[in-house]
Amino acid sequence: MIISAASDYRAAAQRILPPFLFHYIDGGAYSEHTLRRNVEDLSEVALRQRVLKNMSDLSLETKLFNETLSMPVALAPVGLCGMYARRGEVQAAAAADARGIPFTLSTVSVCPIEEVAPTIKRPMWFQLYVLRDRGFMRNALERAKAAGCSTLVFTVDMPTPGARYRDAHSGMSGANAAMRRYWQAVTHPQWAWDVGVNGRPHDLGNISAYLGKPTGLEDYIGWLANNFDPSISWKDLEWIREFWDGPMVIKGILDPEDARDAVRFGADGIVVSNHGGRQLDGVLSSARALPAIADAVKGDIAILADSGIRNGLDVVRMIALGADSVLLGRAYLYALATHGQAGVANLLNLIEKEMKVAMTLTGAKTISEISKDSLVQELSRIPSGLAPLAQGTAA
């Protein structure tokens, strides 16, 4: 299959992966309205084309949390990444490291902190949930710090799991799920050999290290279901600060008031995110939520954004809407599933090229020059409360 755009990786991944894994990452909550709007709203953001601006010295480099990034992109935390390619977290981290951008390790990764961190030169980021087992949280923070992780990404939009109906149909959960997953695995030989046979162990490395015993997929589902904590509050940030003194980013912000609270409670950054449409269906897309949040806290805190970003043009759109940088999730996982580290490296090359084209044709020589002035306001009235966007078809 010819890979000429990031979207090609999705089609390739669907052929390679067992359905339970493809639909786990591809799907969203409930009827998946927010999942679709994440992509559609962002695709409808119209950029303002400018010409004859002498763009010969264009630069994508930026700084974030005292780190220099080759472009304003980081790889988002993705659970079970190591089930999509052999030791997937290690491969994805290597691709990000070579590109000069951060990789974020998920709490529920297959490869533990201690396996991934020594393989890269750049300090990785670590993502943490608020869980009932505070002993695990403290253990994870201490291990992340000991491994040299530079930034903590604290996910706050999962006090309870979202209702992901696709999982019951695909075999991730539901009746006879284990048997269905087994049959899917043996009928997808490329994945079965690369990951099923050679990608072991398949446990959740960070959790296994804490519990002192292997953990499989069933353990993953059960452990998370029993440990999400609906009592989460802003005071939990104060507790985390007892064990973490580096940059802390709050992931899962969709409302300006929550963004202001993040500033008040001393966070260093926020991620404008609806968890890729996987938690509460019907909430605003990140593209629609971002401008009002930027108006509220831009300059007071670093603003990152995710959900719906599929290519370099989308990165430029998010920055024009108010983000300082973005996180890539599904896009890089499709590439990882298709060609491993090389796939992620190629995806990042594609994104860089697409960003350069977009910046060249909008007259922005640097990341700091991408702003709301880069948008055609008549078509880009994204903030909640303004006129709806013109209808279009998502790319």
UniProtKB/Swiss-Prot annotation:
InterPro entries reported in the protein's UniProt record: Aldolase_TIM, Alpha-hydoxy_acid_DH_FMN, FMN-dep_DH, FMN_HAD, FMN_hydac_DH_AS, LldD
Membrane topology value: Peripheral membrane protein
Active site per UniProt: H275 (proton acceptor)
Cofactor: FMN
GO cellular component: plasma membrane
GO biological process, one term: lactate metabolic process
Record-listed substrate binding positions: Y24, Y129, R164, R278
Catalyzed reactions per annotation: (S)-lactate + A = pyruvate + AH2
GO molecular function terms listed in the Swiss-Prot or TrEMBL record: FMN binding; L-lactate dehydrogenase activity
Protein EC: 1.1.-.-
Family according to the record: Belongs to the FMN-dependent alpha-hydroxy acid dehydrogenase family.
Job of this protein: Catalyzes the conversion of L-lactate to pyruvate. Is coupled to the respiratory chain.
Identification of the protein by name: L-lactate dehydrogenase
The organism of origin for this protein: Enterobacter sp. (strain 638)
Designated gene of the protein: lldD
